[in-house]
Amino acid sequence: MYLVSLLSSCCLLVLLGTLPARAAHEDPVEKVIEGFSRGLSNAEREVGKALEGINNGITQAGREVEKIFGELSNMGSQAGKNVEHGLDKVAHDINNGIGHAGKEAEKFAHGVNHAAGQVGKETNKIIHHGVSQGGSEAGKFGQGSHHAFGQGGNVANKLGHETHHAFGQGGNVAHKLGHETHHAFGQGGNVADKLGHGGNVADKLGHGTHHAFGQGGNVADKLGHETHHAFGQGGNVADKLGHGTHHAFGQGGNVADKLGHETHHAFGQGGNVAEKLGHETHHAFGQGGNMADKFGQGAHHAFGQGGNMADKFGQGAHHAFGQGGNMADKFGQGAHHAFGQGGNMADKFGQGAHHAFGQGGNMADKFGQGAHHAFGQGGNMADKFGQGAHHAFGQGRDMAETFDQGAHHAFGQGGREGGRLVQGAGQGLSHAAKEAQQFGHGHGHGYYAAGQTWQEGDKVIHPGVSQAGEEMEQFGQGVRHTIKQAEKEAEKVAHGVQNGVNQAQKEAEKVAHGVQNGVNQAQKEAEKVAHGVQNGVNQAQKEAEKVAHGVQTGVNQAGKETQRVGQGVQTGFNQGQKEAEKVAHGVQTGVNQAGKETQKAGQGVNYAAGQAEKEAEKLGQGVHHAAGQEMNRLQQDVHNGVNQPSKEANQLLNGSHQGQGGYGGQHGGAATTTVVSGASVNKPFINFPALWRSIAATMP
């Protein structure tokens, strides 16, 4: 009996031990949890794959956008290179035109200098030749005139002073001529300076240039008048020279000595005027006539302030083309001012290069910040892509969060059901344990107790099992309900995930469509930008052509004005040459008149000298005649005086010869003469006192 009860107890204990193990081994809640875990893992994997695909799509779209931006940057760089190349060509053509104009101006200046030097040489030759000729004549005149004339005033001094004053007046006029011409061309230069500073070049170029060269024309007019006045003054001087010279030679005086010096001084002063004429003629062609000397520095001053192109070409070459044409000076900064306000491409190319292409085209400056403004309002994709993508997936995230919450809620519901199951099982087991305790307490009552216990055990087991079965059925129903609820929630979650994925796909499609639209819009904007760049380049080319045409027109206008100035200078130069020829002719006439007067004076001197010589010859002839007569008389008297003693001596000799005989006479004739001995004759052979008395008696 005891053994049976022991075996039954062991079986009961084994039964009670195996039931929780089987229940624990075959727990459906764990299966449900494992199923949910597997479903969530699969859902997470799918969502991760979807996110990875979206991320790959976004990365690919970013690469495409970067490619588009790179192409746009290359297009902008190519357009900038084309614009710079075109502007370099324009600047090169302008440099060539300016260099050619400078060469022509240099040739012109060289020709003017050569012509002026040639005229100066010819003038110097004429004046020096005339002065030398007049000086030679005056020197000849001065040699005999000082002895021929003894009266007169300081006419030659006055003549030299008046001539010097006259040529000094002419020299002052010539000096004023140089200054007035310099002032005239300086005034034209100031106008050209104003021309360079004024922006309205096209308007002011015609008017200002006309004004400048009109002022130069007035100067040329003044040049003609002042030259005429100067050479007219010189003509008056030449007239006075003729009259004064005639008056000088009419008056006489210290003309001979001073005329050679003062006339040479007067004409030397005129020679200085001629030398000044050579210099001042070169100076009279304007300050711009220093082109040969200053050509490398300021060769274009003759063409106006705007012509400082050669000196300032690297800095402000385009001042002649207007305020907008500061291309060379501001090329790196604001080269496109000439092409319009919108054309600040060079200076602002890295910052705001697209201002010329429209307000929406601030891509260069704002490219890294708001590059997509050009692609539309919806194109804030780059900045907002992370946010917008998260917003697009935020709905899915809300779904995922809702899924987590719903799953947690579903599992919470299941947990509650499980908790209720455990509580129900615990209550059943607690009731069974109480019954077992009661069974343990009453196991010593014997069979009754055992039977009672069995009955009680049956009562306990059957109600407990029934209760447990009911609880298990309720648990199974709860589990089924929970599983169904979880399935519904899972379906909702899957549906939500599907909706989220679909929504994400739709958002991704919208994003891709937006990216596509943005790319298309960007392509359209890029095409617009390229078209705008092309239009800007074409406009720049048109403006450059206009600038080149304006430059060509300005150069042609400057060439025409230069030709006009050259013609005016040539006319003034020819007029000056004519006036110089008139002066030289007047000087030559004065010199010839002076020469004629000198020749007349010389002829008068020669006539007087010849007359005096004739008188001297007459005097000499008279003296010679008188002396000859007296000499003849003297010779006759001497001859007579000599002949008389000779006769007397002959008589004496003859008498001695007759008285002594031949031999003794010969002896006495040879040895007893008065001259030889002076002892045998009373009278001498020659009576010298008587001879001199007779000679003195014959002298008148």
Swiss-Prot record:
<feature type="compositionally biased region" description="Gly residues">
    <location>
        <begin position="658"/>
        <end position="668"/>
    </location>
</feature>
<dbReference type="InterPro" id="IPR024153">
    <property type="entry name" value="Suprabasin"/>
</dbReference>
<dbReference type="InterPro" id="IPR049502">
    <property type="entry name" value="SBSN_GxHH_rpt"/>
</dbReference>
<feature type="region of interest" description="Disordered">
    <location>
        <begin position="183"/>
        <end position="258"/>
    </location>
</feature>
<feature type="compositionally biased region" description="Polar residues">
    <location>
        <begin position="641"/>
        <end position="654"/>
    </location>
</feature>
<dbReference type="Pfam" id="PF21009">
    <property type="entry name" value="SBSN_GxHH_rpt"/>
</dbReference>
<protein>
    <recommendedName>
        <fullName>Suprabasin</fullName>
    </recommendedName>
</protein>
<feature type="signal peptide">
    <location>
        <begin position="1"/>
        <end position="23"/>
    </location>
</feature>
<dbReference type="GO" id="GO:0005737">
    <property type="term" value="C:cytoplasm"/>
</dbReference>
<feature type="coiled-coil region">
    <location>
        <begin position="488"/>
        <end position="546"/>
    </location>
</feature>
<dbReference type="GO" id="GO:0005576">
    <property type="term" value="C:extracellular region"/>
</dbReference>
<keyword id="KW-0732">Signal</keyword>
<keyword id="KW-0964">Secreted</keyword>
<feature type="region of interest" description="Disordered">
    <location>
        <begin position="283"/>
        <end position="391"/>
    </location>
</feature>
<feature type="region of interest" description="Disordered">
    <location>
        <begin position="133"/>
        <end position="158"/>
    </location>
</feature>
<keyword id="KW-0175">Coiled coil</keyword>
<feature type="region of interest" description="Disordered">
    <location>
        <begin position="641"/>
        <end position="669"/>
    </location>
</feature>
